[in-house]
From Swiss-Prot:
Alphabetized GO MF terms: rRNA binding; structural constituent of ribosome
Function: One of the early assembly proteins it binds 23S rRNA. One of the proteins that surrounds the polypeptide exit tunnel on the outside of the ribosome. Forms the main docking site for trigger factor binding to the ribosome.
NCBIfam families: PRK05738.2-4
Family, as annotated: Belongs to the universal ribosomal protein uL23 family.
UniProt keyword annotations, A-Z: Ribonucleoprotein, Ribosomal protein, RNA-binding, rRNA-binding
Gene Ontology biological process terms in this record: translation
SUPFAM superfamilies, sorted: Ribosomal proteins S24e, L23 and L15e (SSF54189)
Protein name (Swiss-Prot/TrEMBL): Large ribosomal subunit protein uL23
A GO CC annotation given for this chain: ribonucleoprotein complex
InterPro entries: Nucleotide-bd_a/b_plait_sf (IPR012677), Ribosomal_uL23-like (IPR013025), Ribosomal_uL23/eL15/eS24_sf (IPR012678)
Organism, scientific name: Rickettsia prowazekii (strain Madrid E)
Pfam families: Ribosomal_L23 (PF00276)
Assembly and oligomerization: Part of the 50S ribosomal subunit. Contacts protein L29, and trigger factor when it is bound to the ribosome.
Length: 98
């Protein structure tokens, strides 16, 4: 699979206080395409970030019900991946920011 296809699998990294604290354990969190599988995510992260992936955990997040001007609607469903890297590898999210 080409590298451009891998970019379609990974939507964006999740950078919060909680995900920053688990990054010390070599775990990184991403929103991913809802059709992505564990093996394809592993290959995509290894190709894009040039790291060795140990394990991938996936969570399906159901959209919340919200009310806007009296009309009840729902937010979109999402898929989240928690990627565990090998011991000496890490991902620098802000590597290109100056």
């Amino acid at each position: 699979m080409s590298v451009y296809k891998y970019y379609d699998l990974i939507r964006k990294p999740i950078i919060t206080e909680k995900t920053t604290s688990i990054s010390e354990q070599n775990k990184y969190t991403f929103y991913v395409n809802k059709f992505a599988k564990k093996l394809s995510l592993k290959r995509a992260i290894e190709a894009i970030f040039k790291v060795k992936v140990k394990k991938v955990n996936i969570l399906n997040i159901k959209g919340k019900k919200k009310r806007f001007k009296g009309i009840i609607g729902t937010q979109i469903n999402r898929k989240k991946a928690i990627v565990t890297l090998e011991k000496d590898h890490n991902i620098d999210y802000a590597g290109g920011i100056k």
